[in-house]
Amino acid sequence: MSFINSWLRSDIKMINAYHVPISADMVKMDAMESPFSLSDELTDQYLTYLVDAQLNRYPSPSSDKLNQTLRLLMNIPKEFGVLLGNGSDELIQLLALACNTGDTVLSVEPSFVMYGMITKFTRLNYQSVLLTDDFEIDDDTMQKAIKTYNPKLIFIAYPNNPTGNMFNREIIEHIISSTKAMVVLDEAYYAYTTDSFLTDIAKYPNLVLLRTVSKIGFAGLRLGLLIATQDTVNQLNKLRLPYNINILTQVSANFLLQEKNTINANVSVILAQRQVLFDALVKINVLKVYPSQANFILFKAPNTNILFDFLKENGVLIKNLSVKKKLINCLRVTIGTEEQNQKFINIVEKFYIL
Protein backbone atom coordinates (compact mmCIF):
# COMPACT_ATOMS: atom_id res chain seq x y z
CA MET A 1 0.00 0.00 0.00
CA SER A 2 1.33 3.44 -0.95
CA PHE A 3 1.93 6.13 1.65
CA ILE A 4 -1.02 8.27 0.50
CA ASN A 5 -3.44 5.32 0.60
CA SER A 6 -2.46 4.48 4.16
CA TRP A 7 -2.58 8.13 5.21
CA LEU A 8 -5.80 9.33 3.53
CA ARG A 9 -9.24 9.29 5.11
CA SER A 10 -11.06 6.12 4.06
CA ASP A 11 -14.15 7.99 2.85
CA ILE A 12 -12.04 10.18 0.55
CA LYS A 13 -10.52 7.08 -1.05
CA MET A 14 -14.02 5.94 -1.99
CA ILE A 15 -14.98 9.03 -4.03
CA ASN A 16 -13.94 10.33 -7.44
CA ALA A 17 -12.49 13.76 -8.20
CA TYR A 18 -14.74 16.22 -10.02
CA HIS A 19 -14.34 15.45 -13.71
CA VAL A 20 -14.06 18.16 -16.37
CA PRO A 21 -14.16 16.73 -19.91
CA ILE A 22 -11.60 17.67 -22.55
CA SER A 23 -13.09 20.33 -24.82
CA ALA A 24 -10.23 21.46 -27.06
CA ASP A 25 -11.37 22.44 -30.57
CA MET A 26 -15.02 21.81 -29.68
CA VAL A 27 -18.07 24.04 -29.39
CA LYS A 28 -18.49 24.12 -25.61
CA MET A 29 -22.14 23.82 -24.67
CA ASP A 30 -21.68 21.75 -21.52
CA ALA A 31 -20.81 24.07 -18.63
CA MET A 32 -23.39 26.90 -18.61
CA GLU A 33 -20.78 29.49 -19.56
CA SER A 34 -21.61 32.58 -21.59
CA PRO A 35 -20.65 32.13 -25.26
CA PHE A 36 -19.65 35.79 -25.58
CA SER A 37 -16.03 36.88 -25.29
CA LEU A 38 -15.02 40.51 -24.81
CA SER A 39 -15.16 42.85 -27.80
CA ASP A 40 -11.82 44.04 -29.18
CA GLU A 41 -12.50 47.56 -27.90
CA LEU A 42 -13.37 46.36 -24.41
CA THR A 43 -10.36 44.04 -24.39
CA ASP A 44 -8.03 46.95 -25.14
CA GLN A 45 -9.59 49.03 -22.35
CA TYR A 46 -9.39 46.09 -19.96
CA LEU A 47 -5.71 45.43 -20.65
CA THR A 48 -4.92 49.09 -20.05
CA TYR A 49 -6.82 48.97 -16.75
CA LEU A 50 -5.04 45.74 -15.75
CA VAL A 51 -1.63 47.43 -15.88
CA ASP A 52 -2.33 49.00 -12.49
CA ALA A 53 -2.67 45.61 -10.77
CA GLN A 54 0.11 45.42 -8.17
CA LEU A 55 1.04 41.76 -8.40
CA ASN A 56 3.79 42.20 -5.81
CA ARG A 57 1.21 43.12 -3.17
CA TYR A 58 -1.48 41.11 -1.46
CA PRO A 59 -4.97 42.05 -2.65
CA SER A 60 -7.46 44.03 -0.61
CA PRO A 61 -8.40 41.64 2.22
CA SER A 62 -12.03 42.77 2.32
CA SER A 63 -12.48 43.50 -1.41
CA ASP A 64 -14.46 46.63 -0.49
CA LYS A 65 -14.39 48.18 -3.95
CA LEU A 66 -15.49 44.93 -5.60
CA ASN A 67 -18.20 44.54 -2.98
CA GLN A 68 -19.64 47.91 -4.04
CA THR A 69 -19.34 47.04 -7.73
CA LEU A 70 -21.38 43.88 -7.18
CA ARG A 71 -23.97 45.71 -5.09
CA LEU A 72 -24.54 48.16 -7.94
CA LEU A 73 -24.65 45.44 -10.59
CA MET A 74 -27.15 43.28 -8.72
CA ASN A 75 -29.10 46.01 -6.89
CA ILE A 76 -28.29 44.56 -3.47
CA PRO A 77 -29.85 46.63 -0.64
CA LYS A 78 -27.25 48.41 1.49
CA GLU A 79 -28.59 46.91 4.72
CA PHE A 80 -27.66 43.37 3.60
CA GLY A 81 -24.20 41.92 4.04
CA VAL A 82 -22.14 40.54 1.16
CA LEU A 83 -19.36 37.98 1.48
CA LEU A 84 -17.16 37.18 -1.52
CA GLY A 85 -15.74 33.78 -2.38
CA ASN A 86 -13.37 32.16 -4.84
CA GLY A 87 -16.37 30.85 -6.73
CA SER A 88 -19.61 29.78 -5.05
CA ASP A 89 -17.97 26.46 -4.20
CA GLU A 90 -15.78 28.17 -1.60
CA LEU A 91 -18.86 29.74 -0.03
CA ILE A 92 -20.71 26.41 0.06
CA GLN A 93 -17.69 24.92 1.82
CA LEU A 94 -17.54 27.88 4.22
CA LEU A 95 -21.17 27.28 5.20
CA ALA A 96 -20.45 23.61 5.75
CA LEU A 97 -17.46 24.46 7.94
CA ALA A 98 -19.74 26.55 10.16
CA CYS A 99 -21.65 23.39 11.11
CA ASN A 100 -20.84 20.88 13.82
CA THR A 101 -19.31 17.56 12.78
CA GLY A 102 -22.12 15.17 11.94
CA ASP A 103 -24.75 17.84 11.30
CA THR A 104 -27.15 17.14 8.45
CA VAL A 105 -27.27 18.98 5.15
CA LEU A 106 -30.50 18.60 3.19
CA SER A 107 -31.06 19.25 -0.49
CA VAL A 108 -33.10 17.93 -3.39
CA GLU A 109 -32.16 15.50 -6.14
CA PRO A 110 -31.31 16.02 -8.88
CA SER A 111 -29.50 19.26 -8.15
CA PHE A 112 -26.03 20.84 -8.07
CA VAL A 113 -23.52 18.07 -7.37
CA MET A 114 -21.25 20.20 -5.16
CA TYR A 115 -23.79 20.34 -2.32
CA GLY A 116 -23.34 16.62 -1.71
CA MET A 117 -19.62 16.52 -2.47
CA ILE A 118 -18.70 19.34 -0.09
CA THR A 119 -20.95 17.88 2.60
CA LYS A 120 -18.96 14.65 2.42
CA PHE A 121 -15.60 16.46 2.33
CA THR A 122 -16.47 18.26 5.57
CA ARG A 123 -17.78 15.14 7.33
CA LEU A 124 -21.38 16.22 7.48
CA ASN A 125 -24.38 13.99 6.87
CA TYR A 126 -25.96 14.52 3.44
CA GLN A 127 -29.64 13.76 2.86
CA SER A 128 -31.75 14.53 -0.17
CA VAL A 129 -35.38 14.59 -1.21
CA LEU A 130 -36.20 13.34 -4.68
CA LEU A 131 -38.03 15.78 -6.91
CA THR A 132 -41.26 14.72 -8.57
CA ASP A 133 -41.29 13.46 -12.16
CA ASP A 134 -41.89 17.07 -13.22
CA PHE A 135 -38.85 18.18 -11.18
CA GLU A 136 -40.93 19.94 -8.54
CA ILE A 137 -40.52 19.89 -4.76
CA ASP A 138 -43.28 17.96 -3.04
CA ASP A 139 -44.09 20.07 0.00
CA ASP A 140 -45.25 17.20 2.21
CA THR A 141 -42.17 15.10 1.42
CA MET A 142 -39.84 18.01 2.12
CA GLN A 143 -41.55 18.86 5.41
CA LYS A 144 -41.31 15.23 6.47
CA ALA A 145 -37.58 15.23 5.67
CA ILE A 146 -37.07 18.41 7.69
CA LYS A 147 -38.77 16.82 10.72
CA THR A 148 -36.90 13.53 10.28
CA TYR A 149 -33.38 14.83 9.69
CA ASN A 150 -33.46 18.18 11.54
CA PRO A 151 -30.98 19.70 9.05
CA LYS A 152 -28.52 22.46 9.91
CA LEU A 153 -28.31 23.57 6.27
CA ILE A 154 -30.76 23.30 3.38
CA PHE A 155 -29.45 23.95 -0.14
CA ILE A 156 -31.89 24.72 -2.95
CA ALA A 157 -30.84 25.93 -6.39
CA TYR A 158 -33.31 28.54 -7.68
CA PRO A 159 -33.68 27.93 -10.59
CA ASN A 160 -32.52 24.37 -10.28
CA ASN A 161 -29.44 22.96 -11.95
CA PRO A 162 -29.57 20.73 -13.98
CA THR A 163 -33.33 20.85 -14.59
CA GLY A 164 -33.65 24.59 -15.25
CA ASN A 165 -37.03 25.10 -13.59
CA MET A 166 -38.10 27.49 -10.85
CA PHE A 167 -39.63 25.77 -7.84
CA ASN A 168 -42.96 26.92 -6.45
CA ARG A 169 -42.31 30.10 -4.45
CA GLU A 170 -44.90 29.27 -1.78
CA ILE A 171 -43.22 25.92 -1.14
CA ILE A 172 -39.83 27.62 -0.79
CA GLU A 173 -41.33 30.13 1.64
CA HIS A 174 -42.89 27.27 3.62
CA ILE A 175 -39.47 25.59 3.86
CA ILE A 176 -37.78 28.78 5.08
CA SER A 177 -40.45 29.56 7.67
CA SER A 178 -40.84 26.02 9.01
CA THR A 179 -37.23 25.18 9.86
CA LYS A 180 -34.48 26.30 12.21
CA ALA A 181 -31.97 25.46 9.49
CA MET A 182 -30.12 28.02 7.43
CA VAL A 183 -31.80 27.89 4.02
CA VAL A 184 -29.38 28.63 1.19
CA LEU A 185 -30.98 29.57 -2.13
CA ASP A 186 -28.44 29.29 -4.91
CA GLU A 187 -29.39 31.96 -7.45
CA ALA A 188 -26.50 31.28 -9.83
CA TYR A 189 -28.81 31.84 -12.80
CA TYR A 190 -30.53 34.94 -11.41
CA ALA A 191 -29.97 36.90 -14.63
CA TYR A 192 -32.15 34.53 -16.66
CA THR A 193 -35.10 34.21 -14.28
CA THR A 194 -38.32 36.03 -13.51
CA ASP A 195 -38.05 35.82 -9.72
CA SER A 196 -35.57 36.24 -6.88
CA PHE A 197 -35.58 35.99 -3.09
CA LEU A 198 -33.15 38.88 -2.71
CA THR A 199 -35.50 41.26 -0.89
CA ASP A 200 -36.90 38.39 1.22
CA ILE A 201 -33.68 38.37 3.25
CA ALA A 202 -35.21 41.23 5.26
CA LYS A 203 -38.12 38.95 6.16
CA TYR A 204 -36.26 35.71 6.91
CA PRO A 205 -33.12 35.86 9.11
CA ASN A 206 -32.29 32.23 8.24
CA LEU A 207 -32.24 32.93 4.49
CA VAL A 208 -28.95 33.14 2.60
CA LEU A 209 -28.49 33.71 -1.14
CA LEU A 210 -25.61 32.61 -3.33
CA ARG A 211 -24.84 34.25 -6.65
CA THR A 212 -21.97 34.16 -9.14
CA VAL A 213 -20.65 36.07 -12.13
CA SER A 214 -19.86 32.81 -13.94
CA LYS A 215 -23.16 32.65 -15.83
CA ILE A 216 -23.12 36.27 -17.05
CA GLY A 217 -19.86 36.11 -18.93
CA PHE A 218 -17.06 35.83 -16.40
CA ALA A 219 -16.63 32.19 -15.38
CA GLY A 220 -12.85 32.61 -15.56
CA LEU A 221 -12.88 35.08 -12.68
CA ARG A 222 -14.07 32.42 -10.21
CA LEU A 223 -16.09 34.92 -8.22
CA GLY A 224 -19.11 34.09 -6.11
CA LEU A 225 -20.99 36.03 -3.47
CA LEU A 226 -23.09 35.26 -0.44
CA ILE A 227 -25.87 37.68 0.50
CA ALA A 228 -27.51 37.62 3.93
CA THR A 229 -28.26 39.77 6.94
CA GLN A 230 -25.26 41.81 8.02
CA ASP A 231 -25.05 39.87 11.29
CA THR A 232 -24.93 36.54 9.43
CA VAL A 233 -22.18 37.80 7.12
CA ASN A 234 -20.16 39.16 10.06
CA GLN A 235 -20.14 35.74 11.70
CA LEU A 236 -19.46 33.74 8.53
CA ASN A 237 -16.63 36.10 7.63
CA LYS A 238 -14.63 34.55 10.50
CA LEU A 239 -14.29 31.40 8.37
CA ARG A 240 -13.18 33.17 5.20
CA LEU A 241 -9.55 32.58 4.32
CA PRO A 242 -7.48 35.79 4.14
CA TYR A 243 -6.94 37.32 0.71
CA ASN A 244 -9.31 34.79 -0.85
CA ILE A 245 -10.11 37.03 -3.85
CA ASN A 246 -6.86 37.45 -5.76
CA ILE A 247 -5.70 40.78 -7.17
CA LEU A 248 -6.35 39.85 -10.81
CA THR A 249 -9.94 38.86 -10.04
CA GLN A 250 -10.52 42.03 -8.03
CA VAL A 251 -9.08 44.37 -10.65
CA SER A 252 -10.72 42.52 -13.55
CA ALA A 253 -14.13 42.34 -11.93
CA ASN A 254 -14.06 45.97 -10.84
CA PHE A 255 -13.61 46.97 -14.47
CA LEU A 256 -15.68 44.36 -16.33
CA LEU A 257 -18.70 44.32 -14.02
CA GLN A 258 -19.23 48.02 -14.58
CA GLU A 259 -20.14 47.18 -18.19
CA LYS A 260 -23.75 46.68 -17.16
CA ASN A 261 -25.18 47.55 -20.59
CA THR A 262 -23.00 44.93 -22.28
CA ILE A 263 -23.86 42.31 -19.66
CA ASN A 264 -27.60 42.99 -20.00
CA ALA A 265 -27.40 42.96 -23.80
CA ASN A 266 -25.71 39.56 -23.78
CA VAL A 267 -28.30 38.22 -21.33
CA SER A 268 -31.07 39.41 -23.65
CA VAL A 269 -29.49 37.58 -26.58
CA ILE A 270 -29.24 34.38 -24.55
CA LEU A 271 -32.88 34.68 -23.47
CA ALA A 272 -33.96 35.08 -27.09
CA GLN A 273 -31.78 32.19 -28.21
CA ARG A 274 -33.12 30.03 -25.38
CA GLN A 275 -36.58 30.33 -26.87
CA VAL A 276 -35.29 29.65 -30.39
CA LEU A 277 -33.41 26.57 -29.22
CA PHE A 278 -36.36 25.34 -27.15
CA ASP A 279 -38.73 25.66 -30.11
CA ALA A 280 -36.30 23.84 -32.40
CA LEU A 281 -35.87 20.96 -29.96
CA VAL A 282 -39.62 20.64 -29.40
CA LYS A 283 -40.07 20.11 -33.15
CA ILE A 284 -37.99 16.94 -32.90
CA ASN A 285 -40.83 14.65 -31.87
CA VAL A 286 -38.72 11.95 -30.22
CA LEU A 287 -37.37 14.41 -27.66
CA LYS A 288 -38.96 15.51 -24.40
CA VAL A 289 -37.86 19.09 -23.75
CA TYR A 290 -38.16 20.74 -20.34
CA PRO A 291 -38.88 24.47 -19.95
CA SER A 292 -35.99 26.48 -18.55
CA GLN A 293 -35.39 29.71 -16.68
CA ALA A 294 -31.63 29.34 -16.85
CA ASN A 295 -29.04 29.55 -19.63
CA PHE A 296 -29.39 25.87 -20.51
CA ILE A 297 -32.06 23.39 -21.57
CA LEU A 298 -32.58 19.85 -20.30
CA PHE A 299 -34.04 17.29 -22.68
CA LYS A 300 -34.71 13.56 -22.74
CA ALA A 301 -33.57 11.71 -25.86
CA PRO A 302 -33.67 8.13 -27.19
CA ASN A 303 -30.25 6.53 -27.67
CA THR A 304 -28.82 9.12 -25.31
CA ASN A 305 -25.23 7.95 -25.16
CA ILE A 306 -25.02 7.44 -28.92
CA LEU A 307 -26.40 10.94 -29.55
CA PHE A 308 -23.95 12.39 -27.02
CA ASP A 309 -21.02 10.70 -28.77
CA PHE A 310 -22.35 11.72 -32.20
CA LEU A 311 -22.39 15.36 -31.10
CA LYS A 312 -18.80 15.07 -29.85
CA GLU A 313 -17.70 13.47 -33.11
CA ASN A 314 -19.18 16.47 -34.89
CA GLY A 315 -17.45 18.99 -32.64
CA VAL A 316 -20.13 19.84 -30.07
CA LEU A 317 -19.78 19.06 -26.36
CA ILE A 318 -22.88 19.01 -24.13
CA LYS A 319 -23.52 17.40 -20.74
CA ASN A 320 -24.57 13.76 -20.42
CA LEU A 321 -26.69 13.32 -17.29
CA SER A 322 -28.26 10.00 -18.19
CA VAL A 323 -26.93 8.09 -15.17
CA LYS A 324 -28.18 10.60 -12.57
CA LYS A 325 -31.24 10.10 -10.37
CA LYS A 326 -34.45 11.10 -12.15
CA LEU A 327 -32.42 11.98 -15.27
CA ILE A 328 -32.37 8.71 -17.19
CA ASN A 329 -31.79 9.44 -20.91
CA CYS A 330 -31.35 13.16 -20.21
CA LEU A 331 -28.87 15.58 -21.76
CA ARG A 332 -28.27 19.24 -20.97
CA VAL A 333 -27.23 21.86 -23.51
CA THR A 334 -25.99 25.35 -22.67
CA ILE A 335 -27.44 28.20 -24.74
CA GLY A 336 -24.80 29.35 -27.21
CA THR A 337 -24.62 31.91 -29.98
CA GLU A 338 -27.10 31.71 -32.84
CA GLU A 339 -24.46 29.95 -34.95
CA GLN A 340 -23.56 27.46 -32.21
CA ASN A 341 -27.19 26.68 -31.47
CA GLN A 342 -27.92 26.08 -35.14
CA LYS A 343 -24.94 23.75 -35.46
CA PHE A 344 -26.16 21.79 -32.44
CA ILE A 345 -29.70 21.52 -33.82
CA ASN A 346 -28.46 20.45 -37.26
CA ILE A 347 -26.46 17.61 -35.72
CA VAL A 348 -29.38 16.42 -33.58
CA GLU A 349 -31.72 16.53 -36.58
CA LYS A 350 -29.18 14.63 -38.65
CA PHE A 351 -28.89 12.00 -35.93
CA TYR A 352 -32.63 11.41 -35.95
CA ILE A 353 -32.73 11.76 -39.79
CA LEU A 354 -35.18 14.65 -39.89
Swiss-Prot record:
CDD domains: AAT_like (cd00609). The keyword Amino-acid biosynthesis applies. The keyword RNA-binding does not apply. Keywords: Amino-acid biosynthesis, Aminotransferase, Histidine biosynthesis, Pyridoxal phosphate, Transferase. It catalyses: L-histidinol phosphate + 2-oxoglutarate = 3-(imidazol-4-yl)-2-oxopropyl phosphate + L-glutamate. InterPro entries: Aminotransferase_I/II_large, HisP_aminotrans, HistidinolP_aminotransfase, PyrdxlP-dep_Trfase, PyrdxlP-dep_Trfase_major, PyrdxlP-dep_Trfase_small. Belongs to the class-II pyridoxal-phosphate-dependent aminotransferase family. Histidinol-phosphate aminotransferase subfamily. This is Histidinol-phosphate aminotransferase.
